[in-house]
């Protein structure tokens, strides 16, 4: 699943390519991609004629701020969640359709934003002007603070973790604890901070939480600089792979030597997800 760095990479690409471009129409090939409460017709009618002012990211959600009608001061929104395998690709309209194409958004000059999604879990929303974004895209209301927010302090993270009697890796995947963090970067941050993934939150010391907060920010920044991670489906808006996988410390490296101590990287199942770590470097 695309995590914060992959979604941020897509956001930056969209801001480079789609701003101030007029949406001329669209085509929804898989109707369930358009999330309730609005219909496919509402979605297409709502976005057609709009221009994109800017793209925002909240956790793993992408939010396009659309141009408002002259008669109102409130703005409509276009929301996207890539889920497991979603891709947003900026293409010429005459490009052959990929078999997993779900939604096409047409722009002037024969360009389009194409939503491709093999597993079909991805979703798109239209939020009319005058309606709170969180009332339509309800998952936004449950998100924790962003790791790049000033609110993501040591005290904040300690308060989120200390009363949870579950492995710290499992807690870090909870979007109400840290928004945008997923399996890849939780493993990487735990390695950088020297904490084993199965350590209970109640057993993590404050000095470890300080290291963990710093590590989370560092690994996310490093991955964004590398354009994210591609192990299976992720592509940026130009169809290019991310490169963080080549510099990963532990993720997807089971059986290989640790880059720090040379011990073998191990993998276990924790909460139904694979966790990668080094027994020598993490305690």
Curated annotation (Swiss-Prot):
One of its GO terms (molecular function) is class I DNA-(apurinic or apyrimidinic site) endonuclease activity. It catalyses: Hydrolysis of DNA containing ring-opened 7-methylguanine residues, releasing 2,6-diamino-4-hydroxy-5-(N-methyl)formamidopyrimidine; 2'-deoxyribonucleotide-(2'-deoxyribose 5'-phosphate)-2'-deoxyribonucleotide-DNA = a 3'-end 2'-deoxyribonucleotide-(2,3-dehydro-2,3-deoxyribose 5'-phosphate)-DNA + a 5'-end 5'-phospho-2'-deoxyribonucleoside-DNA + H(+). Involved in base excision repair of DNA damaged by oxidation or by mutagenic agents. Acts as a DNA glycosylase that recognizes and removes damaged bases. Has a preference for oxidized purines, such as 7,8-dihydro-8-oxoguanine (8-oxoG). Has AP (apurinic/apyrimidinic) lyase activity and introduces nicks in the DNA strand. Cleaves the DNA backbone by beta-delta elimination to generate a single-strand break at the site of the removed base with both 3'- and 5'-phosphates. The gene is mutM. Its cofactor is Zn(2+). A zinc finger (FPG-type) spans 249-283. DNA binds at residues 100, 119, 164. Monomer. GO terms for biological process: base-excision repair. The keyword NAD does not apply. Binds 1 zinc ion per subunit. SMART domains: Fapy_DNA_glyco, H2TH. Keywords: DNA damage, DNA repair, DNA-binding, Glycosidase, Hydrolase, Lyase, Metal-binding, Multifunctional enzyme, Zinc, Zinc-finger. Belongs to the FPG family. InterPro entries: DNA_glyclase/AP_lyase_DNA-bd, DNA_glyclase_Znf_dom_DNA_BS, Formamido-pyr_DNA_Glyclase, FPG_cat, MutM-like_N-ter, Ribosomal_uS13-like_H2TH, Znf_DNA_glyclase/AP_lyase, Znf_FPG/IleRS. The active site is at 2 (schiff-base intermediate with dna), 3 (proton donor), 60 (proton donor), 273 (proton donor). This is Formamidopyrimidine-DNA glycosylase. Its EC number is 3.2.2.23, 4.2.99.18.
């Amino acid at each position: 699943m695309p995590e914060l760095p992959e979604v941020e990479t897509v956001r930056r690409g969209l801001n480079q390519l789609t701003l101030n471009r007029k949406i001329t129409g669209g085509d929804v090939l898989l109707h369930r991609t358009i999330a309730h409460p609005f219909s496919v017709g509402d979605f297409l009618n709502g976005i057609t004629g709009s221009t994109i002012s800017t793209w925002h990211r909240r956790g793993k959600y992408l939010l396009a701020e659309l141009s408002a009608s002259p008669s109102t001061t409130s703005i409509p929104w276009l929301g996207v969640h890539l889920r497991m395998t979603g891709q947003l690709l900026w293409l010429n309209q005459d490009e052959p359709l990929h078999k997993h194409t779900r939604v096409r958004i047409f722009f002037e000059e024969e360009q389009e934003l194409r939503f491709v999604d093999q597993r079909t879990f991805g979703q798109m929303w239209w939020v009319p002007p005058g309606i709170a974004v969180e009332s339509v895209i309800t998952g936004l209301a449950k998100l924790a603070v962003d790791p790049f927010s000033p609110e993501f302090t040591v005290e904040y993270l300690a308060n989120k973790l200390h009363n949870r009697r579950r492995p710290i890796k499992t807690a870090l995947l909870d979007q109400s604890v840290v928004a945008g963090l997923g399996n890849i970067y939780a493993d990487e941050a735990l390695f950088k901070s020297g904490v084993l993934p199965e350590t209970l939150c109640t057993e993590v010391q404050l000095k470890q939480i300080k290291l963990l907060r710093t590590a989370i920010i560092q690994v996310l920044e490093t991955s964004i600089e590398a354009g994210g991670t591609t192990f299976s489906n992720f592509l940026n808006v130009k169809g290019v792979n991310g490169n963080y996988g080549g510099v990963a410390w532990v993720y997807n490296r089971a059986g290989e030597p640790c880059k720090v101590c040379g011990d073998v990287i191990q993998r276990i199942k924790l909460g139904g997800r694979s966790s990668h770590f080094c027994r020598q470097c993490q305690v």
